[in-house]
Structures are given as structure tokens and as C-alpha cells.
Amino acid sequence: MKLFVPALLSLGALGLCLAAPRKNVRWCTISQPEWLKCHRWQWRMKKLGAPSITCVRRAFVLECIRAITEKKADAVTLDGGMVFEAGLDPYKLRPVAAEIYGTKESPQTHYYAVAVVKKGSNFQLDQLQGRNSCHTGLGRSAGWNIPMGILRPYLSWTESLEPFQGAVAKFFSASCVPCVDRQAYPNLCQLCKGEGENQCACSPREPYFGYSGAFKCLQDGAGDVAFVKETTVFENLPEKADRDQYELLCLNNTRAPVDAFKECHLAQVPSHAVVARSVDGKEDLIWKLLSKAQEKFGKNKSGSFQLFGSPPGQRDLLFKDCALGFLRIPSKVDSALYLGSRYLTALKNLRETAEEVQARRARVVWCAVGPEEQKKCQQWSQQSGQIVTCATASTTDDCIALVLKGEADALSLDGGYIYTAGKCGLVPVLAENRKSSKHSSLDCVLRPTEGYLAVAVVKKANEGLTWNSLKGKKSCHTAVDRTAGWNIPMGLIANQTGSCAFDEFFSQSCAPGADPKSRLCALCAGDDQGLDKCVPNSKEKYYGYTGAFRCLAEDVGDVAFVKNDTVWENTNGESTADWAKNLNREDFRLLCLDGTRKPVTEAQSCHLAVAPNHAVVSLSERAAHVEQVLLHQQALFGENGKNCPDKFCLFKSETKNLLFNDNTECLAKLGGRPTYEEYLGTEYVTAIANLKKCSTSPLLEACAFLTR
């Protein structure tokens, strides 16, 4: 799989060709000016013989979202707040292309939400009560979600007595908030300028709708503050002398010039995005259309039609006038991943009661991979009194994604997944520490981690098998992207062979997480009914350290790539599992990199590499809370906890290594807050980075986009 290479491009409006509906994109418009621009785009695309387009007219954005869901339209561009709405049930739309702002040399897929005021007005951000306010629209990012989330502590909102809009209506003297129900909240529409039914409309029929409309509300003297994005002032006031008549309100209750938006803003917001259906969404066709439109009508292209431009007196038709182009959004990115945990948290703060917000902040949501981990997690949750609650995903990558969305807080990962999580912006919090012969006198929580040994195990009876004769044999792996079971052995093999064709080195394998149709999954068994073959969770019989060793023990594979403790934990009566209870340690050997073989007791001198300990990861803003809760939990349920083994044990499992490794003595502090690179070490990070040149993952592809 190739690494994701972003493609920068521009975009415009759409056209009409009904002859081949599968090759046609139906773009949704919300006003007559948008519909006219769309038809100009349609006519020009038709002349090119490029992907055809049809222009669909609806009254407002939510109707466009419904039309796409019902397959009556295919695409529309939305701001972050509406991307969130579109991603919810029953719509389930996903962003497929993001608008790019900034400069060609420094493109960015975000913008800044700002509060603009007239110079000389004498108030700060914490003094807005009783003022007049101008908003882009209800539920929109810069105009509503961000500023109202920030101002919520000042609103005296009693959730049980009134909706949030009611509290805002009482907070400001008067407002223009397009899209609000003007019958229910007349004060929020009082400043709006539309006539008759168009007053407070959720479209350009309301003159104060959108970024330019909200700024005009301020310019006209109707409002005292306009909640817009950083480029709005520049687009409407190209002359610096005119811009100097306005200022920004800062979070620290100071003011700054309008060009100081990087230092003085309310929040950084994901850029506007084109959305489509998650299933049968014509994603490739939409991208092909955008690519062709960029090539012919993009920024700085000559001609009467400009994709990122609007006629005099109009702004931001179909797309933002200030956009440079579009970046394709990887398929792994849904609306929640696109918006990110901080933005989603701001939205939750607007929708939940104060008690719900406090409860959410106090608990830790642990992500369990697969049904067996889910079962153990639910036991933990019950014993913790719901201080720890559970989220579940079918793969580790999906759990990492849940943490990125703020739907989970933490999980413990092996080094390979720590690399992935780190690339996505998560940080190590605590390390799984095993018993130590070197530092046995030190408190486990404060003791440095020593790593573990990644080994290649074979049966003693298979006498001719060495590291140098593995090609063509059968292999057992913990899972793709895990350290001892994949990254270390396959990295070594790739370096020796100079090839990334991992499915050609061994004749057959079980590498959970690989393509189920490939030779890398040929040896996998699935569950007791033969289902879920090669899935990277406990449903697959040969998943994980114990599963990979079982694959060898049952003569399915010739070699198992595990950690050295795995052999000890499953031989000489250490395991009561039927398949392991009669296994003898002496019947197994380790393969050394020099081509020799040694007993499993000699792993210190015969291993593939020293691997970093597993560690708990979380978002940086949740790390301190996660650490505090986990240290308290292990005091109750850790190896020497007062409620283990009577009630529950964190580091024991009905099968093996669920949530944490069973040989964990404690979760240890890391000393400061190291980055994932610092925790894993330079050599390991470099080795994984080289291995990722052979193949990446959809999640890494997504995170490369999200963190650019």
C-alpha cells in the first residue's frame, strides 16, 4: 500500500448531464445566486467533456443534507458545525474533500474563529452580556458553536428550564442568528435584516447570513460584535486603513489588531468540507470533478468563470472565495475524526447539562478490543463504580480512532501501535512494568522500564530450521503492526531481502490484520465456528502472543514470533488451557540471528531485538486525569491491590493478556510527559518508519492528513 500523498487543488460549481447518471455529480445549492453559479460551472464542464454535473436547488443546508442522504443530490460544501450534523444519524454523511486556505507555500486545512469589534468600543470578551451580537448562523462553527461554547460559563443556563438558545437570547440584548426559529426566539432574530419570511432565514435571503453577512451586521452598526473567521475582515475590507478600524477580542480579555489572529482567536476550526454519502457516495467521481475544475478554473486561472469567486455583491457561493483549492480526505476519516476531539468536546458542552459535562470529565472511558476485552472491561467498570467505563472496537486501530474522536480516553498498546497512536497525536501516559531482577528494591511505579525480548520460537524437533532457512516456511504472528510479532521480524527480513513482498517470503502465515484473502491469513482459524478468520482481536484463535504460540504448538506453523515470556507463560504447567497444559519448555528452541539455535532459557543471548514496554496512551489534554485515575485503580485492583484477587484484578485474564499483559506488576510513571518518539527510542522509531515505507495503514494515512 502506498503512502498517502496529498493533492492540492481548486474547485467550482457544478453542471448538468442526465445521459449517464452514474457519471454525474448532483451538487446541492441553497440560493438563486448559488444555483446560477452552479449552472455556469455545469456549462463549462460540459464543454470540457469532463465529469458532468447537475445543479439541485434546496432552501437551506439541512435540506441539502437530507437530499444527499435520500440520493436526490450527491455533494455540498459545509462548515464544521454542519459537517458534524451531517455525520449523525440518520444522515451518516462523511467529508470527502477539505477546502485549503493560507498560501500555496503554506496551505492549511483549518481557519481561526474570531470575535470582531469596532475599534474604540470599550468592552472585552468577558463583558459581552447585554451587547448586540452578529452570528453567521445557528450551529455553525465560527458563528455559534465556538463562541457560545466559550461564553457558556457566563450564560447562567439552567438546562432543565430552557433550551440553550433561550439562555443566549437573555445574555445578549439583541442578536442576528440566522437559522434560529424566530417565533420561539424573536430576540435572536431582532437584528436580522431580511424582509418578511426571509428575516433570519438560513440562506443568503437573509442579508446578515454567513461570514460576510455577520460582518455587515457589525459594519452597519446593528451589532457590537461579529463572530466570524479570520479572513472575513480581509475579504470585506481590502484596504488596511479600513481594517484598522476593527479589532479582535482575545481569550485573555485583551484586544489585538485584526491581523494578529494567530495570537488572538477563539479556536482553530477544521476547514469547510465537501460531504457525500458514506455508502455509494460517488467519492471518486466527485474528486475527479474537483480535480478537473481546479485544473481549468482554479485559483489564478484566467477566464470569465472562477471556481473560488463570486459576482459583485455576493460572497462564498458554493465554496469560500478565499479557498486555494481542495485536499482529498482519506476514506478512514469520518466526520468525527475530521472535526477532532476538541471541536467535538465544544459541541458536547453545548448539548449536555452541566452535570453531564462534569460526569464526562470525571470518568475514564477505556477502549476494549474485541468481545473478550469488552467482558473484562465491563467487570472493571462495575467494580470501579463507573469511574471507568468502556467503549469497544473490533481492532486496535479503531480504538485509537475512538480516542482521537473523544469517544474513549485510553488503552494500553504495544510499541508498534504506540508508533501509530503517536503519529496521530496521542501521548504515552503510563508504562506496563514487569518484575525486575535489576531494580527489585525500587517501587514498581517509579522503576524504569526495561523493555522485553522479541524472539523467534520453533519446535526442538524441527532440527534443520534456523533464522537463515525461514524462507518458504509457515509463520505465526501476534498481529500486523505489533512489535514482537510483526514489526521486528518483518523489518529484519525486509532489510535482509530488500523486498516488501511479505506475503511471498513465507509459504503460509497467520498474521491477524492482514488481507484475509492473502497467504498471510492462510493459517488463521477464526473463532470456534470458523468465523472472523484473521481478525486482529481475540475472536481469532491465533491472535496475540498466546495465539501465535498456540499456532506453533498445534503444528500449524513452523515458527512463532512472540516475546520471550510467552513460552514461559504457556509451558510446564503455567497455563491450564487444554492446548497448553501438557507443553514442555524443553521442546522449544529460539532462533538466533547468527543462524544458531538455543534453549528458551537463553533469550538474553538469543533474541531478535529488545522491544519497548507496552504503554497506556491518551490525548494530551486528558493524560493527567487518565494517569490519576489509573494509579488509583491499580491501588485497588493491581497485583498488590486491596481488592485483588477478591473482587477484580487488572493484570489477570480468563484467557491471556486482556486490556493489559498478565505479567504486568504495575503501571509505572514515565517521568515527565515524553513524546511517543522519546518513549519508543530513536532506533525503534527509525526501524518502524522504514518498515512503513513498505506499507502504511488507513489510520496512518488518515492521521497524516489530520496532523498536516
UniProtKB/Swiss-Prot annotation:
Disulfide bonds join 28-64, 38-55, 134-217, 176-192, 179-202, 189-200, 250-264, 367-399, 377-390, 424-703, 444-666, 476-551, 500-694, 510-524, 521-534, 592-606, 644-649. Pfam families: Transferrin (PF00405). One of its GO terms (biological process) is bone morphogenesis. Hydrogencarbonate 1 binds at residues 136, 140, 142-143. Residues 1-19 form the signal peptide. It is found in: Secreted; Cytoplasmic granule. Poly-N-acetyllactosaminic carbohydrate moiety seems to be needed for TLR4 activation. Glycans are attached at residues 252, 300, 495, 564. This is Lactotransferrin. InterPro entries: Lactotransferrin, Transferrin, Transferrin-like_dom, Transferrin_Fe_BS. The gene is LTF. Residues 25-352, 364-693 form the Transferrin-like domain. One of its GO terms (cellular component) is plasma membrane. Hydrogencarbonate 2 binds at residues 478, 482, 484-485. Fe cation 1 binds at residues 79, 111, 211, 272. Monomer. Found in a complex with LTF, CLU, EPPIN and SEMG1. Found in a complex with MPO and LTF; interacts directly with CP, allows Fe(3+) incorporation into LTF and activation of CP ferroxidase activity. GO terms for molecular function: iron ion binding; serine-type endopeptidase activity. Fe cation 2 binds at residues 414, 452, 545, 614.
